[in-house]
Amino acid sequence: MQSPYPMTQVSNVDDGSLLKESKSKSKVAAKSEAPRPHACPICHRAFHRLEHQTRHMRIHTGEKPHACDFPGCVKRFSRSDELTRHRRIHTNSHPRGKRGRKKKVVGSPINSASSSATSIPDLNTANFSPPLPQQHLSPLIPIAIAPKENSSRSSTRKGRKTKFEIGESGGNDPYMVSSPKTMAKIPVSVKPPPSLALNNMNYQTSSASTALSSLSNSHSGSRLKLNALSSLQMMTPIASSAPRTVFIDGPEQKQLQQQQNSLSPRYSNTVILPRPRSLTDFQGLNNANPNNNGSLRAQTQSSVQLKRPSSVLSLNDLLVGQRNTNESDSDFTTGGEDEEDGLKDPSNSSIDNLEQDYLQEQSRKKSKTSTPTTMLSRSTSGTNLHTLGYVMNQNHLHFSSSSPDFQKELNNRLLNVQQQQQEQHTLLQSQNTSNQSQNQNQNQMMASSSSLSTTPLLLSPRVNMINTAISTQQTPISQSDSQVQELETLPPIRSLPLPFPHMD
């Protein structure tokens, strides 16, 4: 067969293309070889034309002389071609950003029957497990999956979307959906009775797993339905297997527990805890007759006698804590009332409180005038125990109940400190006496040796000076010991760790 194009024409076309390519290459070579007189003073880049250099200089200077004249647009450009390209955004009817997107085409409405036939044929043809007995299906509500209808916009997407409708139809059975297009029924437990909750849970999980396995065998169009079913299964409430804590002492709770144990003895997961003891005797109240109310009250009062709480500001609790704990233990064992703890009859408490308030006011008024001014100074560090006891008695008259205990404790501590200081003082005295005796022995030895060697008239003055120095050294030691004894009779009060009561 002859070719439709003659050979001469093909050769002419090839020659023309070769000529054009050679010409373009020659032009490029000529441009590259041509001199570039216009050079950038900043980056030293050379250009063939001056306008190219000026356009390049705007990169370094940041000048943008070309502004967009569209109302509301404030963009500026350094090159004119960039401005013309920008103007197309305002003038173009089809925006550039939406060129790659697919346009929405509203097609002809598709029949709902065809869409349902194409979308959910797998649920009708799927092999489900055999039907359950009625006693197992009674606490369960089936969910029908029907296609979404009556929507003009999403008519093309009916093959992919489904609607979950929970038993809403005009049928007689409230648990079943009377619709010609019911495709599958997936049981979902909605608070069944407690006796059948655990029995139904096993079947529910098995039925859901069989339904999901049958759906997984369908084609790829039912993938969306599988996702919806899995999310629905996650939303279904399943009876929790965690043990419940229930206090069962009343008759109603006992009856409910017996019924539950009789119905499901294997799956009873309630943990019976002992009820906490109450402070009142409710058993005696329930069993008592209405005639002997007075005797019942007397019994409850005698059996439920509680200790009256003592005051927070009581001085016995602040100063002597151990005695209060011992007395509180004895109160609980014997059941009596101790007046030292501040537990008194409520009838006499008002009178006692008034008397205590009056005594406190009088003691405060007296303490302002009778307290010695030397209490505030440091000169009282050398006072004896009698003055210290007098000052403490004057300052703390309103603490009449706790003052003897406090004074005893203070006296004991001061006596202990004084005994320690006396022992130290005796040790110092014994050391001083031993030193003095040694010095005297040395002096006697020196005197005897000097008397043997020389006569008294020829005694050197140095020996006399040594003896006088030793005697003078012994006298100030004795004087200093007497001063130390006078100063160390009593220690300063502030140095003792005494728990003084806080003044209001």
Swiss-Prot record:
User: What PROSITE patterns does the entry give?
Assistant: ZINC_FINGER_C2H2_1, ZINC_FINGER_C2H2_2
Which residue stretches does the UniProt record annotate as biased composition, category Basic residues? 85-105
Q: Which residues carry this modification: Phosphoserine?
A: 278, 302, 310-311, 314, 377
One Pfam family here: zf-C2H2
One GO biological process this protein is involved in is:
positive regulation of transcription by RNA polymerase II
Top-rank lineage group of the source organism? Eukaryota
GO cellular component terms, semicolon-separated = cytoplasm; nuclear envelope lumen; nucleus
Q: Which residues form a coiled coil?
A: none
PANTHER family per UniProt: REGULATORY PROTEIN MIG1-RELATED (PTHR47428:SF1)
Provide the protein name.
Regulatory protein MIG1
Source organism (scientific name): Saccharomyces cerevisiae (strain ATCC 204508 / S288c)
Instruction: List the top taxonomic levels of the source.
Output: Eukaryota, Fungi, Dikarya, Ascomycota, Saccharomycotina
Gene that this sequence comes from: MIG1
